[in-house]
Curated annotation (Swiss-Prot):
Binds 1 Mg(2+) ion per subunit. GO terms for biological process: L-methionine salvage from methylthioadenosine. It comes from Shewanella sp. (strain W3-18-1). This is Enolase-phosphatase E1. Pathway: Amino-acid biosynthesis; L-methionine biosynthesis via salvage pathway; L-methionine from S-methyl-5-thio-alpha-D-ribose 1-phosphate: step 3/6; Amino-acid biosynthesis; L-methionine biosynthesis via salvage pathway; L-methionine from S-methyl-5-thio-alpha-D-ribose 1-phosphate: step 4/6. The gene is mtnC. It comes from the Bacteria.
Length: 226
């Protein structure tokens, strides 16, 4: 049957975790107050504000309080969909203004070209929004990589630690579990994908990283698909 599609995690796998934590997250925290003030009547932003109030169980929260909640969620690395949507919108402005480029490990830049040439389908699955993933890969160190991807998945597909999220991906891409390889640095994500029947591979870029009973690689150069 063979592998026909590869699903990659982003932070820690295709992208340096430090770029997310030290560049993108602080940028979104700093930009949130002005962004919400200027865009609060935009329908998408308005929906995110309402969803934030609902999740926080603070229906009467004013804009300043909503901003405070969202900034706290960034610091807690909460995977709340309204936060991830707003971060994507904020990062879009940052990329457009040349504030930063999307960090992608060089070995993945080469690998994604190789996989594409092999007619393998390539997807990303991240707690960051689909829009944020597209921005990362379109403004990358290696140029625009988006044309090599067949799709992207985020928290709307499900929690990355839940088996059901990976079942949902399989249903969406219409492949059997053994035709899909999931690559991540996080053991709990690999366990969830494995429970859904997917093939798995752990990316270990740091010697201090927790490892499990999964096939391990330290670079996409080592991932050869027949």
């Amino acid at each position: 049957m063979g592998i026909r599609a590869i699903v990659v995690d982003t932070a820690g796998t295709t992208t340096d975790l430090n770029f997310i934590q030290d560049v993108l997250f602080p940028y979104s925290v700093k930009a949130l107050p002005d962004f919400l003030e200027q865009n609060q009547h935009n329908v998408l932003v308005e929906n995110c504000i309402c969803d934030t109030k609902d999740i926080a169980l603070e229906p009467e929260a004013d804009l300043a309080r909503v901003t405070e909640i969202l900034q706290q969620w960034v610091n807690e690395d909460r995977k709340a969909t309204p936060l991830k949507t707003l971060q994507g919108l904020i990062w879009k402005q940052g990329y457009a203004h040349g504030e930063f480029k999307g960090h992608i490990f060089p070995d993945f830049i080469e690998a994604v070209k190789r996989f594409s040439a092999q007619n393998l389908r390539i997807y990303s699955f991240s707690s960051g929004s689909v829009d944020a993933q597209k921005l990362l890969f379109s403004h990358s160190d290696g140029g625009d990589l988006t044309e090599m991807f067949n799709g992207h998945f985020d928290t709307r597909t499900g929690n990355k630690l839940d088996k059901q999220a990976y079942c949902n991906i399989l249903n969406t891409i219409s492949l059997s579990p053994k035709q899909v390889l999931f690559v991540s640095d996080v053991i709990e994500e690999l366990k969830a994908a494995d429970a859904a029947g997917m093939m798995t591979c752990q990316m270990v870029r740091d010697s201090k990283q927790r490892t499990g009973e999964f096939h391990k690689i330290s670079s996409f150069d080592e991932l050869l698909i027949e």
